[in-house]
Structures are given as structure tokens and as C-alpha cells.
């Protein structure tokens, strides 16, 4: 069977998964520039792969095409490969890098951030409330994207005047429509922006994670310059995207289902149910690059060759009919089993999962309490995709904050 070419536009994430599922638990896919890989969308097989040491995260040791120079700096997915981060390391090196960040994401540390998160949420909601009643507001831009990026930039001590250039690389990093020229330029510009941030923080240290990482580097913790830069790339770039789309997808679910919204806001259905079901039915991440086979073997009924790259289709895993036999594509906040793998599994489980949930549990209830009459300003089928097969999201989420009636009354 011919490889299935993933759509760089990401226009039909779940439709693609349905077509791939017809080929079995793992399907052959074609990426940009004809690069071949495997996509796994089966829950059991994906969980096995994420815990199997025969799959490495390190392309520098295990992807022949990259090692041999066949993958250029202009490849649209190059930043997922070239960056030296804990997401591209295995074993002791991965553990060493992860350990440097663990203290920042403990339950106690995350809970201590509550006042700051609440203050940030209030500021964002106040900004939205200042809009005219008849003005259409993109809540993805003004709230869903702003909350995570502000929190991450605050956590890492990124000065306000440097945030735009630091965050720009992350936005381009998930855009799978990007041209070769733009991809290569982004790789260089993003590295330069992060390097400039590190140099600034060396001279202006603070009580933040960037300063702590620099101190660890300078005190001989075996953190290399490339690892320092790569770690900041990972957390300031991709680090906030999961929460951005989790916020947006859950808001959309509540906007299109008045009965669900009433039951949740009244307390009949717990908010945490919406959080978990959102992660299951609309995983914020779609096809996440990459894992690499370190030997030949068979899994999921297919033969994987040594060096083959693999993407995990998190958007498909949560809808696996073998796990969720009862209407897996439907959002059901009362579903007894909301099993998903949206934050990963095994040693690479998302470090920021606890913080993401904490921010969501503060932000989304506050959003719907502040704007109880909020309505979509377009039909659901008019919402456009984000332009990526790496993440699962919409380009925007336009609403009338006080409802259509208030807008029409102006």
C-alpha cells in the first residue's frame, strides 16, 4: 500500500486518522520532501512504543537520513530534529536534563503559582471585557494563547520586550506549511533569539528558570551550551502549545453544547470532567515527531526497520474504538472512561502536565463565569484549521462575548 501523505494544512485531522486506521494500528506516511515515516494511532501499540527502549528519541544517533545529511536545515520539520533537548535524548542524558527542571513543576511549586495565574487570568478577562458589545473577539488570540505564553515567559524570566522574538520561532515550529527557506531562516533566527536571551539573563539574573539553568551550566552541571539553548527552545516554544489548544477545544465544546455548559457551570458536572474529555477527544497534539527504531522488529502487525522514524498520532489515540467503543468521536463529559495519552507515557511524560491542568482549572471556569452569555460568532464548520499536522487546533475562535442579542442591540 502506498504511503499516506499527511496534509501540511492539517485541515482534517480526525478524517486523516480514520483513513490511516483502515491500514491497521500503524500506517506508513509521507512527510514533506518525500520523507517516509510511520504513524501510530492505536492506543495499546502507542503506549507500548512510548515505553519501549528500542525506540529512541535521538536522531543524532539513530536516524541515518539525518546523520548522512539527507535532511537539510530547510526541511519544514527540522527544528523537531536539530534541537538538542530532553525531547531528543534518551537514558542518562534525558534524565540529567529532566532533573534540572523537576523542581519547577512539583505539585507544591505549581500550587504556589495560583495567585499569579489568577492575576494573569483576571488581566486577560479585563482586556476582553473592554471590547465593545458588538465587537467580535478572537478568544484564542486574546485568552487561550495569551495565558500559557505569559505564564511560561514569566516562569523563565523573559523580559516583555524580548517575548515576541522568542515566541515567534515556536509558532513557526508547529507550522507544517512552512517553506524550506522559511524553515531554515527560522532555525537560525530562533537559535539567535534564545542565545540573546541567555546572554541577557547572564547579566541580569533573576528568580526564574532561565537564570537557574544558566547557573547550573556555569557551575559545571554537564549542561552544554546546545542543551541550554535547546531546553529553552523546547519549553518556551512547544511548551505552551498543548495548553493553548486544550483551552480552545474545551471552550468550543462548551460553546456548542448549551446543555453541557449549563450542567458544568452549575456544578452538576465537575470541571475536571471537561478537562479530561477534552484531552481524550481533542488531543491538543496531533502527529508528534519523532521516535526512531534502533533495530529491526515487528510491532502492531508491521515490520519496522532500524532507523525508521515514527510519529505518535495523539489525536487518534484518544478516539481508538478498541478503548472507547461507545461513540469514541463524541464529546461526553460523563463518559466513565476518559483514558488518553495526550501528555505522553513513560520517561518522556510531559513535564508541564501538572501546570497545564492547574492553569486550565483556573482559567476556563473564570472565562465562562465572566462571560456567561458568550456565543460563537461563526458556525462551527466555518472554523479553520491551524495549518499543522503536528498540533490539533483552530486558527481562531471568534465569539460574541455577551451573546448575539447584545451585539445586534448596538
Swiss-Prot record:
Substrates-to-products reaction catalysed: 2-hydroxy-5-methyl-1-naphthoate + 2 reduced [2Fe-2S]-[ferredoxin] + O2 + 2 H(+) = 2,7-dihydroxy-5-methyl-1-naphthoate + 2 oxidized [2Fe-2S]-[ferredoxin] + H2O
Domain of life, per lineage: Bacteria
This protein's name: 2-hydroxy-5-methyl-1-naphthoate 7-hydroxylase
GO MF term list: heme binding; iron ion binding; monooxygenase activity; oxidoreductase activity, acting on paired donors, with incorporation or reduction of molecular oxygen
EC number of this enzyme: 1.14.15.31
Cofactor or coenzyme needed: heme
Residues annotated as binding heme: 350
One record GO biological process: antibiotic biosynthetic process
Role according to the record: Involved in the biosynthesis of the naphthoic acid (NA) moiety in the chromophore of the enedyine antitumor antibiotic neocarzinostatin (NCS).
PROSITE patterns per record: CYTOCHROME_P450
Protein's gene: ncsB3
Sorted UniProt keywords: Antibiotic biosynthesis, Heme, Iron, Metal-binding, Monooxygenase, Oxidoreductase
Amino acid at each position: 500500500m502506498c504511503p499516506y501523505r499527511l496534509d501540511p494544512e492539517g485541515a482534517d485531522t480526525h478524517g486523516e486518522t480514520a483513513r490511516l486506521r483502515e491500514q491497521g494500528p500503524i500506517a506508513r506516511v509521507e512527510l514533506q520532501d518525500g520523507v517516509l515515516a510511520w504513524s501510530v494511532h492505536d492506543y495499546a501499540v502507542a503506549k507500548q512504543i512510548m515505553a519501549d527502549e528500542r525506540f529512541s528519541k535521538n536522531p543524532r544517533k539513530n536516524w541515518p537520513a539525518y546523520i548522512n545529511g539527507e535532511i537539510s536545515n530547510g526541511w519544514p520539520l527540522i527544528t523537531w530534529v536539530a534541537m538538542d533537548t530532553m525531547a531528543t535524548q534518551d537514558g542518562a542524558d534525558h534524565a540529567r536534563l529532566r532533573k534540572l527542571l523537576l523542581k519547577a513543576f512539583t505539585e507544591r511549586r505549581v500550587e504556589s503559582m495560583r495567585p499569579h495565574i489568577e492575576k494573569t487570568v483576571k488581566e486577560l478577562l479585563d482586556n476582553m471585557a473592554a471590547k465593545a458589545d458588538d465587537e467580535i473577539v478572537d478568544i484564542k488570540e486574546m485568552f487561550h494563547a495569551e495565558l500559557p505564553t505569559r505564564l511560561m515567559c514569566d516562569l523563565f524570566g523573559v523580559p516583555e520586550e524580548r517575548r515576541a522574538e522568542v515566541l515567534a520561532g515556536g509558532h513557526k515550529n508547529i507550522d507544517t506549511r512552512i517553506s524550506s527557506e522559511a524553515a531554515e531562516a527560522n532555525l537560525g533566527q530562533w537559535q539567535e533569539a534564545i542565545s540573546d536571551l541567555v546572554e541577557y539573563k547572564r547579566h541580569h539574573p533573576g528568580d526564574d528558570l532561565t537564570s537557574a539553568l544558566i547557573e547550573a551550566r556555569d557551575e559545571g552541571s554537564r549542561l552544554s551550551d546546545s542543551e541550554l539553548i535547546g531546553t529553552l527552545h523546547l519549553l518556551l516554544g512547544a511548551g505552551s502549545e498543548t495548553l493553548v489548544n486544550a483551552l480552545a477545544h474545551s471552550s468550543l465544546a462548551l460553546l456548542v453544547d448549551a446543555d453541557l455548559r449549563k450542567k458544568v457551570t452549575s456544578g452538576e458536572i465537575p470541571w475536571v470532567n471537561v478537562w479530561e474529555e477534552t484531552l481524550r477527544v481533542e488531543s491538543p497534539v496531533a502527529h508528534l515527531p519523532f521516535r526512531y527504531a534502533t533495530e529491526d522488529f515487528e510491532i502492531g502487525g508491521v515490520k519496522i526497520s532500524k532507523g525508521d522514524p515514527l510519529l505518535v498520532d495523539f489525536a487518534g489515540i484518544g478516539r481508538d474504538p478498541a478503548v472507547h467503543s461507545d461513540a469514541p468521536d463524541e464529546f461526553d463529559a460523563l463518559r466513565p472512561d476518559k483514558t488518553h495519552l495526550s501528555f505522553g507515557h513513560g520517561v518522556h511524560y510531559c513535564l508541564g502536565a501538572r501546570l497545564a491542568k492547574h492553569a486550565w482549572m483556573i482559567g476556563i471556569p473564570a472565562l465562562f463565569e465572566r462571560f456567561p452569555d458568550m456565543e460563537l460568532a461563526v458556525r462551527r464548520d466555518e472554523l479553520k484549521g491551524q495549518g499543522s499536522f503536528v498540533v490539533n487546533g483552530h486558527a481562531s475562535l471568534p465569539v460574541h462575548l455577551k451573546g448575539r442579542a447584545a451585539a445586534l442591540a448596538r
